[in-house]
Every structure is written in structure tokens, then in C-alpha cells.
Regions:
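Catalytic domains of riboflavin
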Residues: 2-215
Length: 215
């Protein structure tokens, strides 16, 4: 039993390191809630590595809403408030006001328009007036304790950016099936195999960052 646990921990570490290498190289990865449940998954990319080609791939093959998870400090600095919510679930997705770039934008819907907004959001020189609200890119505020506080795709994507020694700003899109239903583990594995995307669970990220006792 001890040997099995050690082997599993080593395997999880290799998975995490492979995913981190992909993120550093600007390759998208898949984050899944859990391997032991047929849960949902997101395609994720470090925001500072976004290109029109990668965003177009994510939009085409994930099909969900394009979101930009970040820490609260980024939203505060850019004066982007949280959306008002009447949901009582403490784990509700933490949406801030949607944004577009204020300049050099057409409708805000195109990949190039959203890349423009992403690049301004990532830039350390950007100011609140660089953005129009509402828009077509959806910021998400990660909890300050990240995966130690909330085990969501928002926090896990920011954790992966930090592990890759990049800015704690990600791009995530939920994966949907052709018929509009949410993709579950079998469909996520099929997508990963088809496009050679590495996949990692939230628990694996948490274990790699904080140790097995954190799970």
C-alpha cells in the first residue's frame, strides 16, 4: 500500500510537471474536476501566451464562455467590479463585469478583439480607461487562498500559471459537446487524445502544490 501511494504521488508529479511545461510553452491544457467522477473540464491557457490561433482553437473546440481568471488585485487596479449575484452557493463562479478593449476594437466578439482585451488586461501599464464594460471577455476573481480555499477551475488555472512562473492570469473555456451538452470525462479524454492535449485534475494540481495531505 505504501509503495502504491508513493508510485501514485510520483505519477501525479510527472503529470503536473508536464502540464506546467506545456503552459510555459504556450500550449493549452485541459483541467478536469475529478477523474473519479464524470465531471466538467476547461481548456486552459496562460493569458500572456494567448495568440489568435490558440484562442480560435479553444473557442472552436471548447465552445463555452471565454473567461480570464485572475487575482483580486488585478480587478481592483483596473476598477472592474464584481457582478451582482443572487446565488447563495458559496462556490458560485466569481464573475466580474465583462470587458472589451476600449480602443482598436470592432464588435468585441472576434478572436482578435478578445485578444486585444486580453493583452491589455495582462499589461502592467493598462489603466481602467483602457476597458469598456460590459464586453465579451469575462474576468473571474480567484479566492485569495486559491486551491486551499476553493477547488474550482478559476483557482486551479491561476495556480498553474503561478507554478509555471507566469503572471497569475489565465484563459479558460468550458468544454461542450457538439449537441450543446457539457463534456464529461470520456469526451474530455477523446478531445485530449485527438489534439494531443495534456490533462490534469484539480486534485492533482492541489497535491503537487500543497502536498497529499491537502486533498
Amino acid at each position: 500500500m505504501i509503495q502504491y501511494v508513493m508510485n501514485q504521488t510520483l505519477q501525479n508529479s510527472v503529470i503536473a510537471q508536464t502540464v506546467i511545461s506545456d503552459i510555459k510553452a504556450g500550449r493549452p491544457v485541459i483541467i478536469v474536476d475529478s477523474y473519479d467522477r464524470e465531471n466538467e473540464g476547461d481548456i486552459m491557457l496562460a493569458a500572456e501566451m494567448a495568440t489568435t490561433e490558440t484562442l480560435a482553437f479553444m473557442a472552436k473546440h471548447a465552445r463555452g464562455i471565454m473567461c480570464i481568471p485572475c487575482l483580486a488585485e488585478r480587478l481592483d487596479r483596473l476598477a472592474i467590479p464584481m457582478m451582482q449575484s443572487n446565488k447563495l452557493d458559496k462556490f458560485v463562479t466569481p464573475f466580474a463585469n465583462s470587458i472589451d478593449a476600449a480602443q482598436d476594437v470592432s464588435t468585441g466578439v472576434s478572436v482578435s478583439d478578445r485578444l486585444n482585451a486580453i493583452q491589455k488586461f495582462v499589461s502592467e501599464s493598462s489603466v481602467p480607461s483602457d476597458f469598456a464594460q460590459p464586453g465579451h471577455l469575462f474576468p473571474l476573481r480567484a479566492r485569495s487562498g486559491l486551491l486551499q480555499e476553493r477547488q474550482g477551475h478559476t483557482e486551479s488555472s491561476v495556480e498553474l500559471c503561478l507554478l509555471a512562473e507566469m503572471k497569475p492570469i489565465a484563459i479558460i473555456i468550458e468544454v461542450m459537446n457538439d449537441d450543446g451538452s457539457m463534456a464529461r470525462l470520456p469526451q474530455l479524454e477523446e478531445l485530449a487524445n485527438k489534439f494531443k492535449l495534456n490533462m490534469i485534475s484539480i486534485d492533482e494540481i492541489r497535491e503537487y502544490k500543497y502536498g497529499k495531505d491537502s486533498i
